[in-house]
Amino acid sequence: MTTEQSVITDEMRQAIGVESEPWTVEVEKTGVRMYARAIGYTDPIFFDEASAKEEGYRSLPCPPGFLGTPIFDPATSDPTFGQPRRGQRRFNTPYTRGLNGGTDIEYFTKGSSDAICAGDVLQASSKIADLTERRGSLGPMLITTSETIYRRDGTVVAIMRGTGIAY
């Protein structure tokens, strides 16, 4: 970048690594089935509980990417379908446009008997992991990396890392 002034304020830097209040994520059979169908999965383990149990799962397993699905709960969510109200802080920046820079989910479960399945109740919390500035072909950009940690009975079962690009 040139000698442009940084849009990353001290307040923004202080927010890096600060974990939000936890919120509850209930994994439900209907949600698993709908997500699997929408994505195009055809494996019966995502639709039929008997098939899932034959493969060693406790119930219908979460398909890859399921945890990244936004869930609107009127009691806890932003009415504009954003993050939970107690999720990550939002900051004012001069940028008016945004892009999803991608999502990666790392699972810490060990095999089918330990997989995240329908019926699980997870606790999730999020934090800003990093803020960086770069110059792209359209000008300066603010890149925000966030992490959402999913716990089952206090044990981390997955971490979702997402990248947002403001420009």
Predicted regions and their residues:
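Hot-dog-fold acyl-thioester-processing enzymes
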Residues: 2-102
